[in-house]
């Protein structure tokens, strides 16, 4: 059942190594390499989005890979929230991750 007022953030949305057709929804410049669920959860918590982690879910386009997902409060467009989460993760990872990007 779908939670009202929540957005689903799949790790593939933020993954720099994925193409747009594979599911990435933000630009490569703003994306991060191999985002982890705990990083997404922590970034969403810092942004005040009340994250809920569902670790045993699989992204429908790649149903054989169980990547998990994070539900966050719906405070605006999904792409804007995904970009904010990715930038927060970049900040948490430190300067070495942005130098590689």
Swiss-Prot record:
It is found in: Cytoplasm. GO terms for biological process: SRP-dependent cotranslational protein targeting to membrane, signal sequence recognition. The keyword Cytoplasm applies. GO terms for cellular component: signal recognition particle. One of its GO terms (molecular function) is 7S RNA binding. Keywords: Cytoplasm, Ribonucleoprotein, RNA-binding, Signal recognition particle. Its main location: cytoplasm. Disulfide bonds: none annotated. The keyword Mitochondrion does not apply. PANTHER family: SIGNAL RECOGNITION PARTICLE 19 KD PROTEIN, SIGNAL RECOGNITION PARTICLE 19 KDA PROTEIN. Part of the signal recognition particle protein translocation system, which is composed of SRP and FtsY. Archaeal SRP consists of a 7S RNA molecule of 300 nucleotides and two protein subunits: SRP54 and SRP19. NCBIfam families: PRK00754.1 (NF001973). Involved in targeting and insertion of nascent membrane proteins into the cytoplasmic membrane. Binds directly to 7S RNA and mediates binding of the 54 kDa subunit of the SRP. Belongs to the SRP19 family. This is Signal recognition particle 19 kDa protein. It comes from Methanosarcina barkeri (strain Fusaro / DSM 804). The gene is srp19.
